Amino acid sequence: MTPHINAPAGAFAETVLFCGDPLRAQFIAHHFLKNAQEITNVRAMLGFTGEYQQHKLSVMGHGMGIPSCSIYAKELITEYGVKNLIRVGSCGAVLDEIKLHDVIIALSAATDSNVNRLRFRHYDFAATADYSIFSALIAAAAQQNITARVGTVFSTDSFYHADTELMDLLKRFHILGVEMEAAGLFGVAAEYGARAGCILTVSDHILRQETTTALERQTRFHDMITIALEAAVRLAH
């Protein structure tokens, strides 16, 4: 056990689907996994282990922002032996061609956070998804005939900001989605010798002020969840 995870040793599978919202983790466990058991609930950050297509698989919440996500990722890797972390989350869009509920697979993550510079002794760390997980997500999307956009996302430390210059910059660099964790997750995985990937569903369009409800973000992102589950199976082979 750790200060933040009260699961016993061996409770987690080698692959964990990692959700910002612990209720999304609970939804995945209850609706997609067989024989799912709750294994951790400290601070209401729920985690479950069950089976998907006869493979042991875990799903857990990681909270909002790089600091929270990084704590759980580090502990899962170093204390529980987790090898693969797949963030299954939501994001906002700025590009005109992207719509609500579009699926995005992150190849890399830019950020306004300083955490990777601190980790990498003030040099610029290239925060990229692990190729095995990235390619498994791409293959799973193709297998399921689900269209997924692929490219760079932006991990921000500031959820509430109205920086129009930043939005223009993100559009110019063709940033597919704005979220709060991927860059930090990729950095933690690299530092501790694990693999990480990230798949997102567009829950908001920042410039068009379009949004989904909290309930929709918990329960209606089936395409993303299916891709992540099928990718986990590919990693097990």
From Swiss-Prot:
Keywords: Glycosyltransferase, Transferase. It comes from the Bacteria. It catalyses: a purine D-ribonucleoside + phosphate = a purine nucleobase + alpha-D-ribose 1-phosphate; a purine 2'-deoxy-D-ribonucleoside + phosphate = a purine nucleobase + 2-deoxy-alpha-D-ribose 1-phosphate. The record marks R217 as: Important for catalytic activity. Its EC number is 2.4.2.1. It is an enzyme of class 2 (transferase). GO terms for cellular component: cytosol. InterPro entries: DeoD-type (IPR004402), Nucleoside_phosphorylase_CS (IPR018016), Nucleoside_phosphorylase_d (IPR000845), Nucleoside_phosphorylase_sf (IPR035994). Phosphate binds at G20, R24, R43, R87, V88, G89, S90. PANTHER family: FI09636P-RELATED (PTHR43691:SF11), URIDINE PHOSPHORYLASE (PTHR43691). Belongs to the PNP/UDP phosphorylase family. NCBIfam families: deoD (TIGR00107), PRK05819.1 (NF004489), PRK13374.1 (NF009914). HAMAP family: Pur_nucleosid_phosp. Catalyzes the reversible phosphorolytic breakdown of the N-glycosidic bond in the beta-(deoxy)ribonucleoside molecules, with the formation of the corresponding free purine bases and pentose-1-phosphate. This is Purine nucleoside phosphorylase DeoD-type. It comes from Dichelobacter nodosus (strain VCS1703A). The lineage of its organism: Bacteria, Pseudomonadati, Pseudomonadota, Gammaproteobacteria, Cardiobacteriales.
